Design a protein with these regions (language model features):
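Alpha-helical segments
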Residues: 1-251
Length: 251
């Protein structure tokens, strides 16, 4: 499947609008001063008040494509898949649907809309610790969708738990990350060496406190998929800098 960045943005929004989401649009790359960071680092950052329970004027199902600066990845910039600036394709549930709907929609979008081979998808889930249980619910849903048992991996908090580091009061929880082989034509690719993360579904079930975590009153979903990485796979390329986004800038 060949696709332009414009077509990818439009197809992402169209898919989630068909599931009852409203496009909230992108905000400035510069932080608004309320979150203590200079730049927007994730699509969910401007939505923090609503993820914590404030009603959003456009409803409980939202989507957009947001420009982000991710300085935490700066040492990895220059490889096949990391960028200082990138566009995050996102969608959110604010106390509405949860894991069952989200895993099904992500799988549908990747395989039916974008044509990725479901047999080659790998997915990781939270292995659990003293603060939160193993995410067997998500693993079971992945199996029901057809993800192969040997392609589902349980990983620790450092890999499959999302939170804003050091920020007390913010929502957090286990995430379900999706991976695809950097070279889909390679026979028997090995995880993780031959795979690249293309996106993740974060299940915000908790609020971070000084002493740990407490359950959120409303469970939220925060999804983020990198437009740049999706372009790589959908256009049969092996490096993000080969996409049309960098034409004229990278020889």
């Amino acid at each position: 499947m060949k696709i332009t960045s414009k077509q990818l943005r439009e197809s992402w929004l169209k898919f989630y609008e068909s599931k009852g989401h409203v496009n909230v649009g992108a905000v400035s790359l510069i932080g608004d001063g309320t979150t203590g960071v200079m730049f927007n680092v994730a699509g969910m950052q401007p939505l923090m008040p609503y993820l914590l329970g404030k009603p959003h004027p456009l409803g409980k199902r939202l989507c957009n494509v947001q420009g982000c600066v991710r300085t935490v990845d700066i040492e990895s910039v220059g490889d096949a898949s990391h960028f200082t600036f990138f566009e995050m394709m996102g969608n959110w549930s604010l106390g509405d649907y949860f894991k069952k709907e989200k895993t099904a929609w992500t799988y549908e979008l990747l395989t039916t809309v974008y044509g990725l081979d479901g047999d080659k998808l790998c997915s990781t889930v939270f292995e659990g610790n003293d603060a939160a249980p193993r995410d067997e619910e998500t693993a079971s849903l992945l199996r029901s969708l057809g993800i192969r048992e040997e392609h589902i991996f349980y990983l620790p908090k450092s890999d499959n738990w999302w939170e804003l580091e050091g920020t007390v009061g913010t929502p957090c929880g286990p995430d379900n990350e999706w991976f695809y082989p950097i070279d889909p034509e390679k026979a028997d690719p090995v995880f993780p060496d031959d795979y690249v993360e293309i996106g993740n579904d974060v299940y915000m079930q908790y609020r971070k406190t000084e002493n740990g975590y407490v359950p959120l009153e409303n469970k939220n979903v925060d999804t983020g998929f990198g437009l740049d990485r999706m372009l790589l796979f959908l256009n049969g390329l092996h490096a993000g800098y080969k996409t049309a986004l960098f034409a004229g800038a990278v020889a």
